[in-house]
Amino acid sequence: MKTLSAIAAAGLALTVAAAGIARNPQFEGADPHAMMIGDELWIFPTGGPGGSWAADRFGAFSSRDLKTWRPRGELIRRDQIRWIKDDGAPEHFLWAPGVATRGGRYYLYYSVGPQNPTPSRIGVAVADRPEGPYRDSGRPLITGDKGFEAIDPMVFTDRRSGRIYLYAGGSAGATLRVWELKPDMVSIAREVKVATPPHFTEGAFMHERGGTYYLSYSHGRFNGPDYSVHYATAPSPVGPWRYRGAILTGDARHQGPGHHSFVTLPDGRSLIVYHRWDRAPGPGPFQGERVVAIDRITYAPDGRIRPVRMTDDDAPVLPARHGDTKKVNNR
């Protein structure tokens, strides 16, 4: 990996692959939310001047070929979120962004923590362009409570029903909760009671393929060797869940893979974008910065997701022409 000086100028301490062939890992960062916007793959990670451990702002990166990544500057900073200090906590950090789009606008959902001494919270900010600037909605959308940590938001629009769902939760309590959003994308319509699937810890992600809904999520301590990605399937976006097993686990070279996104390219190929530690010493807890990687996803004939082989290969190349696919819906 090479460092782009433009990132330092933008105040984002993330290392991005420079022009040329980018091999895994792609750049430093954690909790990557990825989505296709036009003919570009966009990645929204946790990171900032304090790295992913003490982030006070969000940035984004985009690529047309998965070889050259363009830093898109700051989306929003902690000091632009007016309500963030109203809980009296001595410090606040931002992590785990999730982005959704509706009606030509972009909605950035994010976690504010830590959980102690006050509950973690989820906020949402709005922009007319994916690179922002984002304007916060003015109030927290979700607040944690005893047994539930309000973290790791992910928004999914079910194209069958048109309903918009917010998935969140994990870590302390390891509880999944789901809400239906109002069409304005910044208000809660109601909470939908769901079961927490087996081995759920945090980082829920929902996508649909061929009428089957896939709920994938991270399991284990975030900086430990058992951190991994598992999944369950369902006939609806809210269950009932059928646990299917782990699809992304650590190996001798790559540790703690998780907090991921699924993306489908215009030609129908599927990718998983996730963070991991590479060559981390010892059995954990791991330290230092995590890195973002991209690997291929394949499905068995019965619809199961095949286990992912983590690679240090070139990232899959985006096709030259942008088309439309109906196989997977994650927006």
Where are these regions (language model features)?
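Carbohydrate-active catalytic/glycan-binding domains of CAZyme proteins
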Residues: A18-R331
